[in-house]
Amino acid sequence: MTQEELDKIIKKHQHFLKQDCKGWEKMKADLSEEQLEHLVFQNADLAYAVFNRARLYRCTIENCNISHASMVEADLGFSTIKNTKFVDTDFTKASLSDAEFNEVRFSGANLSYARFEWSHAPFCDFTNAKLYEARLNSTYLKSSTFNLADMSFCHLANCCLRECEFVKANLSYAFIHGADLTFAKFDKTDLTEVKHDHGTHGFALACPEKGAFTAFKKIFSKPKRNIWSKDVEPLIVELRVPAKALRSSATSRKCRVSEAKVVSITSLDGERKFDVGYSAHNIHFEYRKGQTVVPNKFDKNRWKQCAPGIHCFITRDEAVQYTDF
């Protein structure tokens, strides 16, 4: 199909959408099994159009609305797709591999059994989408949203899922070997039998599951609200977390514990020793050598990062480098 022929079909489809002329019922765009390689879709409204088994290889799709459409077994491989809506569109068994997506909405779309591998798709919206047994291996999905999505049995090996949201999503039996979930948000997420390994970042607990352990935390020399004042020095407190303490780490290297004993307080370079230091978040919370510190409360939610508890790191260097106050 030529670009001119495609543009004519898109123009006729507008009458189908608006129902504004005689015979509009027969003007719906049906591009099933068409060869559409390298064609350009720009500022087009193709809602409810049919692309089943169409070949859209290396197409450019920009600022389009292709919602409620049917793209069953369509091939969008190596395409570039930007600022486009595929709301409630059916991509069952479609191929979206090696493609470039940017700020694309797949909310409510059916991507079951679709191949979405080796693609670049940051900041995309998959809210309430169905990705049952979809293959997204090695796809870059940073900061995308998967809230309420069905991702059961989904293949996510080696994916970048940093800062993604999975609130109330279903990831049961998903495969996340080698995936990066750092700072991902899990809240009421179904993680039944998720398959992960030593290469999966941000999923396993960063601190020991049981037993006592040593942790480190950055505190400050004075109880001042402005921690960047020249007379306020950052310090490192070494903590001994008892075996009975509750512990959590969400999806980062930062841990939370329900209590800890202050072993030592030193300067960042470790050369000078101190007897007392203060929390950056609560100027009344004191860390004194030899004493046990206990927060007012502790949130038991394993996946909550910013929640009540003693925040700390497993290594001293991580505490030294931490600046997110």
Tell me what each language-model feature is.
Residues 2, 8-9, 279, 304:
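Hydrophobic alpha-helical segments and their boundary regions
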Residues 1, 24-27, 307-314:
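Short, exposed beta-strand "edge-strand" segments with a Pro/Gly-rich flavor and a Y/T-containing core
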Residues 7-10, 290-291:
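A short linear-motif detector with a strong N-terminal bias
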